[in-house]
Amino acid sequence: MPDSLSLPLRPLIDKREHQDSLPVEIAQINAQWGAFRDVSEDSLRAQIEADKHKDPWAEDEESDGQSAADVDTSERLEQLYKRRAEITNFALQAHMEAMFALDFVSLLLSKYAPRQAETSMSAILKQVAPLGSLNAEVVNPPPKPESTAKDIKTVSRGWRLQNFDAAANRLLDAATRLESEVASETRYWEEVLAVKNKGWKVCRLPRERQALGVQYGFMEATPIFRDRGLAALRRADDGRLFLDKGLAPQRTRMLRVRVKHCGGISGCSKVQPAVTEDVESIENRILQARDTLYEEELFHEVFREARMLGNQGVITRQNLVQIPVSEEQDILLDLVDDQDLLSDETPMSHEHDTLANAISHSIHILLAYAHRQNLRRRTQPPPPLSTKRRHTPEYLLLRPVMAYLQHSSHVRWVESFLNDIHRVLQSAGLQCEFKATPFSSIRLPTKHTIPTVEALVQTFLAPLESTFSCKLPSSHGSFRVRVRTNAVVPPFGTHFDISVDMPEYPDIQPPSRIGLQEEVATALTHLTMLDILTAIRQDQKSAVEPSEDSKPTEQCLTWSAVYPHHGELVALSPTGPNKKIKVELSAQGLSVQSYTMRGEFTESIDEKASRAQSWKPDSTTPGSPGLMEFVRAV
């Protein structure tokens, strides 16, 4: 063949059955040329010229690569639907064939296991074919040689021996496991019985009825702590009993009471745990859980009451309650665990350890008393139903302690003040007696309507009262001081009631209720000073009274109280100069100064004519005159 003929093998392009709609053509133009504002006549002519000079074969190659992208959207959707329909048909066909096979196998097995085979049969097969209607068997099996039968028999015997050996081993293992389980159960129930015999309440858990629990909490506590007082008694693998406390803290926690005096810690309560030996025993675990729960409830109630006592100076922080006792002393309460005690290196003295321990024991006893009161209220008939929610009052834990400490502080102050006055008067040669009856309101109960312990606690919850009676230097003067402290019901705080018996001054009556120590000291000092003036006048009268065989001397003066509230006495003499003495009294000492007067109320300018004498509480100067001797010498 001299010449070769080349024919292009191009695919035939079928014409479309329908024309594209106008929106489709506009979308195609936008995709190919962009927006219409970018299309101009010049750009179209340039494109036509470029197409004329373009290689047609290159166009065919490009068209082959882009043929898949030019397929119409509707055609692609049709192809997609067709492919999905084919896949669905194939899946349905496979499902039908699998169901046919399942029905065949189920019908075949229904002759030997009808119940199991019936569960996998379709409903149509159950209707058209009864169970066990199809069977299979081997027809004309080939004969087996004698050696094969012998081998099968030997293998069967080996399998039987192996199965017997395995069964024997399983029986021995089961016996060993049963023996250990019996030993574990025996140990578990013995320890449970020991816990019950020691007085603990053993019961089923409310939400886990198959488990046992021990009730170590207090039934009269608040609900949040009452529900935490139940712990499960679990059994370990070896049968040992252990306490599952759930969310309860694993470490021992205790309420610590410290005394802060003059900025430093001067005392701390004993916070060592009570359980020190055999900590791992179940009894000690229960005791530790009970004590920790009790301490947490105690601190919770203390903190709850302390928030209410903010107006009385009580300060609450995150884990601390600070109670003011006096200007120099505060009480600190906080909840600590054993790790905090080991890491606490705060320097402190042990001067007030007894006070801290007493406060700690007191609030523990008061919480137990509150539990008894809850039990008493629960056993009584309930109050009438009401839509209003009943408020749960705060327990009396801090208020009785604060009342006792404040009352003791005020009683010690009054006693110290009267002792100072007594020593001052004794150093001046005056006779004075006072009697102190601290806590006179506390009396042991005589009626046994309630338990003795509760009656004793109720006595300390009542307002505290102490009395001081004093006989003044004069023959008829006396006063009585009653110190009353109440921290439970208003009026709160400590009040002083002073009653006076002074015939020389019948109109003098101090205020019935005094709240400040300075005012009490001023009132008592003033009353004693007035009585000293009365004693001076009585002594002078007894000295100037003439007897039956004697006449009064002209040198004796008669003193009169011109300004008694200023401590001044005046003596008017018809023959000599007039005299005046001024008495000043305080807890630090007694001072008397005499003046010579030209007129009735004019003091002498001559300083040599004035005399003064003072007496201190611890004055032991020999030869110093007493008050009456000094006045007589005037």
UniProtKB/Swiss-Prot annotation:
Record carries keyword Metal-binding? no
- For this entry, the protein name equals Mediator of RNA polymerase II transcription subunit 17
State whether keyword Membrane applies.
Answer: no
A single GO BP annotation from the record?
Answer: regulation of transcription by RNA polymerase II
UniProt-listed Gene3D superfamilies: 6.10.250.2620
Function summary:
Component of the Mediator complex, a coactivator involved in the regulated transcription of nearly all RNA polymerase II-dependent genes. Mediator functions as a bridge to convey information from gene-specific regulatory proteins to the basal RNA polymerase II transcription machinery. Mediator is recruited to promoters by direct interactions with regulatory proteins and serves as a scaffold for the assembly of a functional preinitiation complex with RNA polymerase II and the general transcription factors.
Family statement drawn from the similarity comment of this UniProt entry: Belongs to the Mediator complex subunit 17 family.
GO MF terms listed in the record are: transcription coregulator activity
Name a single GO cellular component: core mediator complex
> Keyword annotations for this protein?
Activator, Nucleus, Transcription, Transcription regulation
InterPro entries listed in its UniProt record: Mediator_Med17 (IPR019313)
Could you give the subunit structure recorded for this chain? Component of the Mediator complex.
A Pfam family reported for this protein in Swiss-Prot or TrEMBL = Med17
Instruction: List, as start-end ranges, the regions of compositional bias called Polar residues.
Output: 611-623
Can you say where in the cell this protein is located?
Answer: Nucleus
Lineage, uppermost ranks: Eukaryota, Fungi, Dikarya, Ascomycota, Pezizomycotina
Ranges where the record places region Disordered: 51-73, 606-626
